[in-house]
Amino acid sequence: MNHDKSPIILIGFMGTGKSTIGKYVADEQNLSFIDIDSYIEEKYKLTIPEIFCKHGEQYFRNLEFTCLQECINTADIIATGGGIIESEEAFNFLKNQKNIIWLDCNIDIIYSRINDDPHRPNANNKTIKQLNDLYCSRNLRYNEIAFKKFDSHLLSISEIYYELLNLIKASDQY
């Protein structure tokens, strides 16, 4: 990565396609990609649910922010966890970044993707109403820091890819 260029940072609720889209774009453009959740699991040798269980959500949010700071100058594309905006430090840090892309999706589709996924501690055993409440509570924050929003349930991966390519070219990056 050219360190003078800002990474593309994918934000959005869990299950909206941040990791899938990030990896796809990185593979297609031969760019570096880091999924913050995977990075945390590799670095700390614990799964996200194990971290939540052993240390709590606040501890995890602190790790998430620390890892985002570590990765900000080393990756071309970064997929964040859906709750990264819950931390004031991370939220304020992201506000100062340039290429924040918000991937959004219909809550019914999100629910079908993540319902009973044991790797998602904030979704586990939640009703669609509980998940929707969490989703709604985060949307204002995503909107506040996003440079561009894509509805991943309305666009295919390749359509989002081409839209991102146009953004990259428009900002003369990579």
UniProtKB/Swiss-Prot annotation:
Keywords: Amino-acid biosynthesis, Aromatic amino acid biosynthesis, ATP-binding, Cytoplasm, Kinase, Magnesium, Metal-binding, Nucleotide-binding, Transferase. It is an enzyme of class 2 (transferase). It is found in: Cytoplasm. Mg(2+) binds at S19. GO terms for molecular function: ATP binding; magnesium ion binding; shikimate kinase activity. Substrate binds at D37, R61, G82, R138. InterPro entries: P-loop_NTPase, Shikimate/glucono_kinase, Shikimate_kinase/TSH1, Shikimate_kinase_CS. Pathway: Metabolic intermediate biosynthesis; chorismate biosynthesis; chorismate from D-erythrose 4-phosphate and phosphoenolpyruvate: step 5/7. ATP binds at G15, T16, G17, K18, S19, T20, R120. GO terms for cellular component: cytosol. GO terms for biological process: amino acid biosynthetic process; aromatic amino acid family biosynthetic process; chorismate biosynthetic process. It catalyses: shikimate + ATP = 3-phosphoshikimate + ADP + H(+). The keyword Magnesium applies. Its cofactor is Mg(2+). Its EC number is 2.7.1.71. The keyword Lipid metabolism does not apply. Binds 1 Mg(2+) ion per subunit. Signal peptide: none annotated. It comes from the Bacteria. It holds the Pfam family SKI. Belongs to the shikimate kinase family. Catalyzes the specific phosphorylation of the 3-hydroxyl group of shikimic acid using ATP as a cosubstrate. Monomer. This is Shikimate kinase. It comes from Staphylococcus aureus (strain NCTC 8325 / PS 47).
